[in-house]
Amino acid sequence: MKLGIINGWDEASFKYVAELGLHAVEFCCNFYVDSMEVAGHTDEIKALSEKYDVAVGSIGRWGETRVDENGEAIPAALQHDKNLIDAASALGCPVYNVGCNWTEGKTYKENCEIAIRYFGQLIEYAKGKNVKIAVYNCDWGNFVHGEKA
């Protein structure tokens, strides 16, 4: 196990993590950041990871509205998740953190079924990429948390 912290994907961030004596970093590429900010720069990020001996331990995207009012995947949101799964794979990052928003007008059971479908698409997409899908334990754009979940 490597200890790390949440930080950015620029050189100053990798240098800072290394100066702390840590060997892992987690990227939070949240809903207000284009996923290509990470996914479009994996060669540069990988070089920084190697230069500073700081592995990318996980990548996550918090706060995204992933399903619409009918419980269907929003194509742009799904594409951001796929971009970041691809980035994780390219960087040797083993975990992608994700949530699923609540759909108003649906029951808890229906919302669970919607989330399972959404997560299932990501799990299927990540097959063969050496990336596991994890659900973050926070309510920011996610109802799958707490005791009931």
Each predicted region: which residue ranges?
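N-terminal pre-domain/capping segments
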Residues: 1-94, 127
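Active-site acidic/histidine proton-transfer and metal-coordination neighborhood
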Residues: 50-51, 67-149
